[in-house]
Amino acid sequence: MTKTTDIEYTVQIWKEGNQFVAHAMPLDVMSSGLTPEEARKALDEAVHLFLITAADMGTLQEILEEAGYEFRQGNWIGPSWVAIEKHSVAVSA
């Protein structure tokens, strides 16, 4: 029997043109849809496929560790976000 574990991630969603873009942090996987719900659903599928592929290739542990996850008590624990902020910088064009 294959052991399964939950791998949590934070989702950011923003509008880009007529699409909504969903980004899974810290895995750095993205997807899009015509609504926030479609983008979220597409992202969940993309993350699932990304993680299954990594597991099949034997690189899941390396990918999760590079993304800041830690393996504790049989589970992968993602980073604890201290802040997610929007900043700007002035640039002369």
Language-model-derived ranges and their functions:
Residues 27-38:
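A short, exposed loop/beta-hairpin motif centered on an aromatic-Gly-Thr core
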Residues 21-23, 30, 50:
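Generic alpha-helical hydrophobic packing signal
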Residues 1-8, 37, 41-93:
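Short, charged, surface-exposed hinge/linker loops at domain edges
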Residues 7-26:
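Short aromatic-glycine-(Arg/Gly/Cys) micro-motifs in beta-strand/loop hairpins
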